A protein has these predicted regions:
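NTP-handling and nucleic-acid-processing catalytic cores
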Residues: 2-192
Length: 192
């Protein structure tokens, strides 16, 4: 029982043709400015904890933020902070509904007269909500059995759903982050 087979995400150096340890990555680390993007993900199924028929009408979106936009084609999930306060708002101009962290609302909607708050919930209430994939590459992962078969991980509810993780904050972005398990150690752990 001391040895098991599993998968682990490691950085790879194309120059050296080998994987790198976290220690090697930390050497010579420099802060730098990376591009960040906010993407809207169309909600297709409301979570069990929230009674919201409008959520499935095609005009409700999660606003997710990422500093790794090149990983968006591999998106398989979204993540909220379990104890963070989130709001569903109605954009008065477009009529669309958006879900994001309450603490980040003023960063995205500067004028309070441009929106109306529909309700406020904790991140843990959104677990299990489903959304439409950005790209068709991994649509098979919607199905739980296919997701488990392809990823080699236990996917009880399939991909393209809401998860919770304590590392999600409201310091930047929308309070919702995108998950690409193939590209990040934290993302991979959340998806397991």
């Amino acid at each position: 029982g001391l040895i098991y087979e599993g998968k682990y995400i490691l950085p790879y150096c194309p120059r050296c043709s080998t994987v790198l340890s976290n220690h090697e990555l930390a050497q010579g680390y420099k802060d730098r400015n990376d591009p960040a993007v906010t993407v809207r993900f169309k909600v297709t199924k409301a979570p069990a904890a929230i009674s919201d028929a409008d959520m499935e009408n095609g005009n409700t979106y999660f606003l997710a933020w990422t500093t790794t936009p090149w990983t968006l084609p591999s998106n398989e999930g979204l993540c909220m902070g379990p104890d963070v306060d989130y709001v569903k708002i109605k954009d008065k101009e477009s009529g669309d509904f958006y879900i994001l962290a309450k603490a980040r609302l003023a960063s995205y909607f500067k004028n309070e007269t441009d929106y109306e708050i529909v309700y406020e919930k904790k991140g843990k209430d959104f677990i299990g909500a489903k959304y439409e994939p950005l790209f068709p590459y991994f649509e098979d992962l919607k199905d739980a059995a296919k997701c488990s078969e392809i990823s080699g991980q236990k996917c009880e509810d399939g991909a393209f759903r809401m998860f919770n993780a304590d590392y999600v904050t409201t310091d930047d972005g929308t309070g919702i982050v995108h998950i690409a398990p193939s590209f990040g150690e934290e993302d991979s752990k959340v998806f397991k």
